[in-house]
């Protein structure tokens, strides 16, 4: 056993986590990010699939690395051939931007116009839909969902982990009520700004486009924010039009890293399989 562990560790000695950043014209500041580069990246000729993984509220770009254990997860999934060797980009547009164009920041524009072009120019990543996916936890799940619904032509799959998709409004305990994106000039929570950005304002147009983004939705059964119900409602709505391209899992846990890490371990292989189907069908 000791030999196999050592051999496994050695096999992934060359996978790396590096820190990077790019200036965003949309935000007027930088977008810091951590980037996972798989073993063999430095000598590879063919471009790699890229996965964008978004953090939760009041966090930053290091959360998937430091708390989410993404390097170990990716290394192990790749070793088991459950995940194509991939570049994983973990950016931050700010601790409370919710990845939308809101009252304070144009974070959605920043991702599309600044982040994606930077990554695809600097890193050896694919630039086609079948080579690009997105996932996120809580606020990041909210963001991953919105990006998938509004720009389905960009993503081959999405991971929606414990998504903070409160319909019609967030609970009093939600960080969203304190976010500058959803606060008016008087400092009060702006219900119209929340409603405008929420996935419910995007899903009809998504369905009309007809381009399906397969989605893995997962939440904890003891989530104190009621997300297990919100996620179930999302699943049921998507199930009406993409029955074979949406999954929902409820696991034992709350709104915490045990659930978020489990979501990545379970969700990334499924997302990968969906992207591979698209890849082969081109």
Q: What residues fall within each predicted segment?
A:
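Bacterial N-terminal signal peptides
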Residues: 1-7
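Non-catalytic cap/lid and distal C-terminal segments of serine-dependent acyl enzymes
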Residues: 12-282
């Amino acid at each position: 056993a000791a030999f196999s562990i050592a051999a496994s560790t050695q096999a992934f000695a060359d996978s790396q986590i590096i820190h990077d950043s790019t200036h965003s014209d949309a935000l007027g500041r930088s977008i810091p990010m951590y980037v996972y580069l798989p073993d063999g990246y430095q000598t590879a000729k063919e471009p790699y699939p890229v996965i964008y993984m978004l953090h939760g509220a009041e966090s930053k770009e290091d959360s998937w690395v430091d708390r989410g254990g993404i390097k170990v997860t990716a290394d192990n999934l790749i070793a088991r051939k459950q995940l194509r060797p991939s570049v994983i980009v973990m950016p931050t547009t700010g601790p409370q931007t919710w990845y939308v164009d809101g009252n304070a920041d144009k974070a959605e524009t920043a991702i599309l116009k600044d982040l994606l072009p930077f990554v695809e120019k600097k890193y050896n990543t694919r630039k086609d839909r079948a080579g690009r996916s997105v996932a996120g936890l809580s606020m990041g799940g909210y963001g991953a969902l919105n990006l998938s619904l509004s720009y389905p032509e960009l993503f081959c799959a999405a991971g929606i982990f414990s998504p903070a998709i409160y319909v019609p409004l967030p609970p009093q305990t939600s960080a969203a009520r304190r976010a500058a994106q959803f606060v008016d000039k008087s400092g009060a929570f702006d219900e119209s700004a929340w409603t405008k950005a929420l996935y419910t304002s995007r899903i009809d147009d998504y369905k009309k486009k007809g381009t399906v983004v397969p989605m893995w939705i997962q939440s904890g059964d003891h989530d104190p924010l009621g997300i297990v119900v919100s996620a179930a409602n999302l699943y049921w709505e998507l199930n009406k039009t993409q029955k074979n391209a949406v999954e929902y899992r409820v696991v034992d846990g709350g709104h915490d890293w045990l659930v978020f890490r489990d979501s990545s371990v379970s969700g990334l292989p499924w997302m990968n399989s969906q992207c591979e189907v698209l890849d082969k069908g081109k």
